[in-house]
Amino acid sequence: MDSFNPALPSIVESLDDIYKNFENNKKRYEELNETFSKIYNGDKPIFYFRAPGRVNLIGEHVDYSGYCVLPFALEQDTIVAVSFNKLNNDIINIHNCNEKYTPKSIDVSGGGDIEIDMKRHHWTNYVLAAWKGVSQAMEKGGKLKSVNLLYSGNVPMGAGVSSSSALVCVSTLAISYCNNLILNKEELAQLSIKSERYVGVESGGMDQSISFLAEQNTAKLIEFHPSLKTFDVQLPKGVSFVICNSLVDSLKVVTGATNYNLRVVECRLAAVLLAFHCGLSWEKVRRLRDVQYQGNFDLPQLIQLTEQHLSEKQTYTREEVATILDISVEQLVKTYFPSGITVQSEHFELYKRARHVFTETQRVYKFSEICKQQSNFNNNNNNNNNNSSNNTNIIQELGKLMNESHESCSKLFECSCSELDSLTKICRENGALGSRLTGAGWGGCVISLVPNSKVDSFLDAIDTHYYSKFVNPEKLKNIEKSSYSFFTTPCKGACIVSSTV
């Protein structure tokens, strides 16, 4: 891969080109080297790869309905050191620097046909998903080289900042690179999206796309249709985005049947019923965006149509949807429930889910447009007083959109929880202009918009009013505060790291 080709993942020779927190991350790579040598009998890594976690500013649970999102990459990442396994061509060895994650040596002679046991959740399933995806992507079914892998990650697990996707993405990058499969960033993102579905999560694509396509100092507006496109969004000056982990675990693959995957199905059923009531070719509809495209509707019209056709009877059973469409329940499930994915619910909330998706998408576009106007204003106006006044108004409007987003996530999409609702309320009461859950929800993190001058006092207040009151002290005992409560800026996407670290 060419480090000078912007379409391909870059090859980075110095860690300070990636990390602001250079010293701590240097120690991570040194530990990775030392541990690798111990595990693999003196063998040295020949490649290093890293892929970041992400935070979504706004646009929750809309990507799998075909709509745009606005994330940026975190500095926190998953890194992997790699060497070739010269002892056995059919075995890959998977280890982690954190002893909590037990190692596995896995026979991969089946290549792309390797089976992943989704009933037994193990962290190596994500690595196998990447292996399966890359193996299937190889031309003419070429056999992948077996490898020794050692991972190190500091993306908080179960926090809604894409630790699992970072693991899939870094594995996809590592395995493809080691097998001379040259893929650009978009292709790697698409392959990672496909691969992560092998572990039983119907991913919408945001997490993998930003992990590969992120750039320093800019958020990305990501559109998925008609093709994957990204647009830089410069964030306003004078404020910080602060991440606070509720410390309620949010594990999509574990709770998907009643949470994440259920919402995917509800959005699909909402789309097909809306298309049916609008007289469209509903048989071809799979996403809410398909209704917009086929009917040539704008978002306000879609919100009105949702009120008109879905609000009277908000909850449906499989049998009721099948009867309306004049198809069997078996055909409904086969067509609109993603294959290989379990959903545990007899009732499906369609009105609330559709209304959230359409209004949340409006907020994404408003948020990015406000940021664009602010950036253009600052570039064309040198009057400091005007700049200051304009920036204050901009920030307040962005905060309002974030608050509206959380309200919709909580009340319409019902992907919040009592701890997240309490935490966002505490954040607003202690200096945040806007605060919302970020990620899948049902636990995990909130993101808050905080004036730079108030960040330190804000973090202290959250410690006092949330962590000290709502979190078991035993849970905090072995965790550094900076790992669950911190401010962040947009960071670099996935890359290859020179073996000379």
Swiss-Prot record:
The active site is at residue 207. It is an enzyme of class 2 (transferase). Keywords: ATP-binding, Carbohydrate metabolism, Galactose metabolism, Kinase, Nucleotide-binding, Transferase. Coiled coil: none annotated. PROSITE patterns: GALACTOKINASE (PS00106). Alpha-D-galactose binds at residues 54, 60-61, 63, 207, 260. Signal peptide: none annotated. GO terms for molecular function: ATP binding; galactokinase activity. The record marks 54 as: Transition state stabilizer. It holds the Pfam family GalKase_gal_bdg. It catalyses: alpha-D-galactose + ATP = alpha-D-galactose 1-phosphate + ADP + H(+). Pathway: Carbohydrate metabolism; galactose metabolism. Its EC number is 2.7.1.6. GO terms for cellular component: cytosol. ATP binds at residues 158, 160, 162-163, 250, 252. GO terms for biological process: galactose catabolic process; galactose metabolic process. Belongs to the GHMP kinase family. GalK subfamily. This is Galactokinase.
